[in-house]
Amino acid sequence: MVSQRSLLLLLLLTLRDVDSCQGPELVRELVLAKVKALFLDALGPPAMDGEGGDPGIRRLPRRHAVGGFMHRTSEPEEEDVSQAILFPATGATCEDQPAARGLAQEAEEGLFTYVFRPSQHIRSHQVTSAQLWFHTGLGRKSTAAANSSAPLLDLLVLSSGGPMAVPVSLGQGPPRWAVLHLAASAFPLLTHPILVLLLRCPLCSCSGRPETTPFLVAHTRARAPSAGERARRSTPSVPWPWSPAALRLLQRPPEEPAAHAFCHRAALNISFQELGWDRWIVHPPSFIFHYCHGSCGMPTSDLPLPVPGVPPTPVQPLFLVPGAKPCCAALPGSMRSLRVRTTSDGGYSFKYEMVPNLITQHCACI
């Protein structure tokens, strides 16, 4: 049986190069196979469990945007139950605080400040639960020893009257992480456009790695809708992933068919869900893939007007080796990279990676 890797290699040889000469129609499956081959070559195969996974592992949903949210497909749609992930807009960095702290430090030390901006979705919905995930860097033994003498973590909120304590309870979390469950009386804090949290942890170490960034998890449900809101919700949603770039692509005015025959930069909206990688590559959910496509015969508008009595002289593309066939390809040095965020443990940690030379900027017959 031919493996998936061999099949991708075969499709890659068939496509030869995304920016090379192609027929009048570039098969979408071949483009997707080329894109998958480029991603696998740059990032390697995804190191993840299967779709089922270990039932004992708590899987966090995709965290791809500040204030972004996703609906639980298992819940009835009319309930509008959702889960939102909030990353801090700003926060204390390791340049501002020491990397290690001792047991005899003063209470003012070990204070981490984070500014959150709850989205309009969260502020317009009813919060049913909220947790703050914070990377302590401490093992379970250190956490137990600290809790036996004094609370390891204290959470405060900055208000007009100064810092105020936030009622929380410590829950179960993965190693070196603390999960603080906010009490119901603290849920109204998420209705403010700006939320400044101060977390005091004298024993915690400061880390500037992206995968240790703290975040808020908020479960929300819709408030009682009005008649107008119910009518708007009845409108079917867009069944495909979209982005602002894809929306601009759909809103472009139609072009002449002849413009697509000559060498030009084509675009294809590709989602990682379509590639089967939405549990591996969590941001962006989709992107616009640009590639070169079309023939290299001179377009009619560029041909010189015929002169009576003079035989026409064929126009040759510039910068070609004599006898070589021109090819629609990307200009050297014009390829752009794509930055993605991946996870290999279901959402507990993230990794920022770069796929080089993926998106074409300029095309020409060379």
From Swiss-Prot:
The record marks 63-64, 233-234 as: Cleavage. GO terms for molecular function: growth factor activity; hormone activity; inhibin binding; protein-containing complex binding. Glycans are attached at residues 147, 269. Keywords: Cleavage on pair of basic residues, Disulfide bond, Glycoprotein, Growth factor, Hormone, Secreted, Signal. The keyword Glycoprotein applies. Transmembrane segments: none annotated. Disruption phenotype: Inha deficient mice are viable but are acutely sensitive to development of gonadal sex-cord stromal tumors. Residues 21-63, 64-233 form a propeptide. It is found in: Secreted. It comes from the Eukaryota. One of its GO terms (biological process) is hemoglobin biosynthetic process. Pfam families: TGF_beta (PF00019). Its main location: secreted. Disulfide bonds join 263-328, 292-363, 296-365. GO terms for cellular component: inhibin A complex; inhibin B complex; inhibin-betaglycan-ActRII complex; neuronal cell body; photoreceptor inner segment; photoreceptor outer segment. Residues 1-20 form the signal peptide. Proteolytic processing yields a number of bioactive forms, consisting either solely of the mature alpha chain, of the most N-terminal propeptide linked through a disulfide bond to the mature alpha chain, or of the entire proprotein. SUPFAM superfamilies: Cystine-knot cytokines. Dimeric, linked by one or more disulfide bonds. Activin B is a dimer of alpha and beta-B. Inhibin A is a dimer of alpha and beta-A. Inhibin B is a dimer of alpha and beta-B. Interacts with TGFBR3L; this interaction regulates female fertility. Inhibins and activins inhibit and activate, respectively, the secretion of follitropin by the pituitary gland. Inhibins/activins are involved in regulating a number of diverse functions such as hypothalamic and pituitary hormone secretion, gonadal hormone secretion, germ cell development and maturation, erythroid differentiation, insulin secretion, nerve cell survival, embryonic axial development or bone growth, depending on their subunit composition. Inhibins appear to oppose the functions of activins. Inhibin A is a dimer of alpha/INHA and beta-A/INHBA that functions as a feedback regulator in the hypothalamic-pituitary-gonadal (HPG) axis. Inhibits the secretion of FSH from the anterior pituitary gland by acting on pituitary gonadotrope cells. Antagonizes activin A by binding to the proteoglycan, betaglycan, and forming a stable complex with and, thereby, sequestering type II activin receptors while excluding type I receptor. Belongs to the TGF-beta family. This is Inhibin alpha chain. It comes from Mus musculus (Mouse).
